[in-house]
Amino acid sequence: MALHVMDEANRCLQCKVPQCQKGCPISTNIPLAIKLLKENKLDEAGKMLFENNPLTTVCSLVCNHENQCEGHCVLGRKGAPVHFSTIENYISTTYANKMTEGPKPSNGMRVAIIGSGPAGITIAIILARYGYQVTIFEGKDKIGGVLRYGIPEFRLPKSVLDDIEYRHLELKGIKVRPNTLIGSAITIEDLFRDGYKSIFVGTGVWNPNTLHIKGETFGNVHFCLL
């Protein structure tokens, strides 16, 4: 185990009223994850993190930690907060390598997901846990949406998204149809006629808020999130 990760975990005070958890938008049980890690129960910690947030590995890299979990840590009032982002990344990446379980038994119901951004991926994974037969329709050639095409490589390596596609989608029986736009050649009505009982639309917002400065329209200028 990485020593710096354990050193960071040992700094956690295990507060009775954890402010870090209150600062997390999805209420990740941060004290429990750290406690399990310190007890050498990494698999339990990883399972808990992924069940609460299927994109926990992504969030460990790109979340606004300084204003959320770490920003609410009581240790940060007089010094450095517990850097849970480091701990979460270690747990999630280590446990992800062990995630080889196949799909759940089918409940016979088909669901279409339009868009494979963070919302589409998350709802697809959660539905697959309950036996739904999920198909993701993606307009581009790779999954990820803003995660892949809006966040630069140094913040979120594309290998993380490729691993999610394999372990969380392919192994779970979730089908992905890339380069497929819904709305023109294929309509939502077509999907219902094809037997999909429910449809989730998570196409995202792709138009950037430009700065209106000289040179921003050049071909080698790309918009992204940092």
What do the PLM-derived regions correspond to, one by one?
Residues 1-110, 158, 201-225:
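Ferredoxin-type iron-sulfur electron-transfer modules and their immediate structural context
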Residues 7, 148, 193:
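Phosphate-coordinating loops and pocket residues in cytosolic domains that bind phosphorylated ligands
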Residues 27-40, 44, 48-50, 72, ...:
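Beta1-alpha1 glycine-rich phosphate/pyrophosphate-binding loop at the start
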Residues 100-102, 164-165, 188-190, 211:
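Short, flexible, glycine/charge-rich loop motifs used to bind or transfer phosphoryl groups or to couple energy/partner
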Residues 114, 195-204:
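Short hydrophobic core segments
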Residues 177-194:
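A conserved short coil-to-beta-strand element within the FAD-binding core of flavoproteins
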